[in-house]
C-alpha cells in the first residue's frame, strides 16, 4: 500500500528529517494559437498543443544529498494555487502536487521541488496530482543521479 498525500500517515522514524524545500513553479505556460482562426478553432488548436506536449520528470542528485525533482508540462487548472507536500514511508517518496480542480481552462506548468536529505539507496518516487497517481518510478539515489522519464498513460 502506497502512502497518500495526507500528513496524518505514519512516517518511518528514519525518514523524519526528509523534507520538501525550494519549490518553484513556472506559472501557466503560454501556448499560442495560429492567427486568423475563430475563437473555437483557436481553443481547439491550443488544446491539441497541450495534448501534444510531452509530460516528463527529471531527477537530479546533488552534493547536498538532496533530490531535485523537475516535473515538466504538468497539467493543472489555469491560475492554479499549488500546495506541494512530500510524505515518506520506508523507501517510498510521495510528492503531492495539489491545486483546486475547478476551472474552465487548463494550463501546462513546470514544477520544481527539492527533497532530502536522501541516503545512497533505492527509492520509489510517486507523484500525485490532487491525490491521484500521476506516475510511479524506481531509482537509486546518489549525488550523481541524472535521469529523466516521460509520463504516459498507464505509467503509474
Residue ranges and their predicted role:
Residues 6-156:
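Exposed, flexible binding/inhibitory loops of compact, secreted disulfide-stabilized domains
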Residues 2-4:
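C-terminal motif of bacterial Sec signal peptides marking the signal peptidase cleavage site
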Amino acid at each position: 500500500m502506497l502512502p497518500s498525500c495526507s500528513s496524518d500517515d505514519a512516517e518511518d522514524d528514519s525518514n523524519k528529517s526528509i523534507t520538501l524545500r525550494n519549490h518553484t513553479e513556472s506559472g501557466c505556460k503560454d501556448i499560442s494559437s495560429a492567427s486568423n482562426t475563430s475563437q473555437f478553432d483557436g481553443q481547439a488548436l491550443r488544446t491539441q498543443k497541450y495534448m501534444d506536449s510531452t509530460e516528463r520528470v527529471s531527477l537530479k542528485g546533488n552534493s547536498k544529498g538532496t533530490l531535485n525533482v523537475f516535473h515538466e508540462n504538468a497539467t493543472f487548472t489555469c491560475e492554479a494555487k499549488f500546495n506541494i507536500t512530500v510524505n515518506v514511508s520506508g523507501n517510498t517518496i510521495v510528492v503531492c502536487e495539489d491545486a483546486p480542480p475547478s476551472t474552465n481552462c487548463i494550463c501546462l506548468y513546470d514544477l520544481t521541488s527539492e527533497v532530502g536529505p536522501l541516503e545512497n539507496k533505492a527509492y520509489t518516487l510517486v507523484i500525485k496530482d490532487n491525490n491521484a497517481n500521476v506516475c510511479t518510478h524506481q531509482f537509486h539515489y546518489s549525488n550523481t543521479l541524472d535521469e529523466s522519464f516521460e509520463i504516459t498513460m498507464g505509467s503509474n
